[in-house]
């Protein structure tokens, strides 16, 4: 594994369930060779000097995500890490309100990725 301690880390929030889109837009093929939109972002990030990417995903999409976007990112030479945004992963003292099913949002996503981060870090929303 490469020494990436001083290199910037790219964090990509990809835990959305695509309810408005009607599917998992994170892995939806849009390019001529089946590329997802994220593949284009990863290509540009790698060319800009990023060597590590942290994908924030849900366990529910883990297999599909890892076998598509994640696998292509690794094949391109990126050091890939995963953080999981789930409703029950909360700071001490917090609880999930009854009936809540939606993700908590950006601050929660960043909090679950914190253990993977060193400075500098770039967040792609």
Q: Predicted regions span which residues?
A:
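N-terminal glycine-rich phosphate-binding loop and ensuing alpha1 helix
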Residues: 2-71, 80
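Conserved beta-strand termini and adjacent loop/short-helix elements that scaffold enzyme active sites
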Residues: 83-85, 112
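Feature marks short, surface-exposed loop/turn motifs that line or immediately flank catalytic pockets
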Residues: 17-18, 89-90, 121
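Short, conserved alpha-helix that lines the donor NDP-sugar binding/gating region
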Residues: 107-114
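A contiguous, low-structure linker/loop signature
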Residues: 77-83
């Amino acid at each position: 594994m490469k020494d990436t301690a001083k290199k910037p880390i790219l964090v990509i929030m990809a835990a959305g369930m695509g309810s408005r889109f009607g599917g998992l837009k994170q892995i939806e093929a849009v390019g001529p060779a089946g590329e997802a939109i994220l593949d284009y972002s990863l290509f540009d990030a790698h060319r800009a000097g990023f060597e590590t990417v942290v994908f924030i995903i849900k366990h529910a999409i883990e297999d599909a995500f890892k076998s598509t976007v994640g696998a292509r990112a690794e094949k391109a030479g990126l050091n890939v890490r995963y953080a999981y945004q789930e409703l029950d992963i909360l700071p001490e003292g917090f609880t999930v309100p009854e009936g809540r099913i939606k993700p908590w949002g950006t601050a929660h996503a960043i909090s679950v990725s914190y253990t993977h981060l060193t400075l500098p870090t770039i967040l792609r929303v």
